[in-house]
Amino acid sequence: MMPINQLISLLQPENVQVDSFNFKLHSKVTVAILLLSSLLACHGQFFSEPIQCTDIPGVSKQVVDSYCWTHQIYLVTSKTAGHDGRDYAYPGVTAERSDVNDKRFLSYYPWVSLVLFLQALCFVLPNYLWKTILGDNISSLMQHNLKSSGSESVQRNIELDRLAKEWSNSRGAYGHLAVAYLACEALNLVNVVGQMFLIDRFLGHTFWTFGSDIIENSMMPAEVRVDVLSEVFPKMSKCSYWKYGPSGQIDQLDTLCNLPINFLNEKVYIVLWFWLVCLASMTTLYLAYLLTVILVPSLQIKIISSKLPRPANKDNVSFAVHSKKLNGVERLGDWLVLNMLFSNLDKWTNGQIVERMNQVLA
């Protein structure tokens, strides 16, 4: 598993930008949200009272709380529809014994903090794979003294010539980076959708419509409104405790349990639902944009030209970026690397680099 210090380092600002804004939404923003949520859930679980159950005669309250926390609590499904104080005391809670088929057991709550942390690792993985495959290809092309847009110097001209020659010698060598980049961006979409499936399974197949149900319920009149959150994150539940009676028989004793931890859990997953839906949508749009860039080579030239001083000579840009001797994947790789390089430099420097490239390639 990835060390914690590497995970934290991926959240810090980078000196050389080698990924897209979409990548940062996954590997930085989403990871930060998940780690913060995991810490909050961990605090609620280990540094407060996550569960509080009513007393059972002859049994320590601490034992009852621990038992119900580590074993499955449940709701009575036939008592989840209706209104508090009229149809039931609390949603999913009844005084009568219930058939096992009428019970919905809840077992997710002790694992929330761990699952959120593992999800954070999953969102780091595509970016980690991309940077591992990329290596130092961009940093080796970019020298620190090229960032300055000051006056001309002998050293600067030497570095510009070196970069232009290195580029001419390595044209067509970055095709595998284009394939890897597209694969990792696609993996971002697969991961976010997969995580939504995972959460849905983890919460008992209630996550997919979680946010939409909340929005729909909030628009209903108050007299017919139902507490949607109580069905997924109940604040009150039942727990069956088994013990030996005076004559050696096994007695089933039911207790009512309060779950303060679910006040936090419901807020965490509300935020996650809206964020993951937005993230999946933005990632889909970004992949559609990448597909358009791949299918329209002239768009690649426009993107590079936008990072040069105006007016940019598109013929010079096309000559530096696209070689007729290379196939489509190799040209895409050259464009990708040059686009990342220019994203780290100012327009004045980028313009000089294109001029030197044309001189060397001519």
Language-model-derived ranges and their functions:
Residues 1-362:
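Membrane-embedded alpha-helical segments and the immediately adjacent membrane-proximal loops
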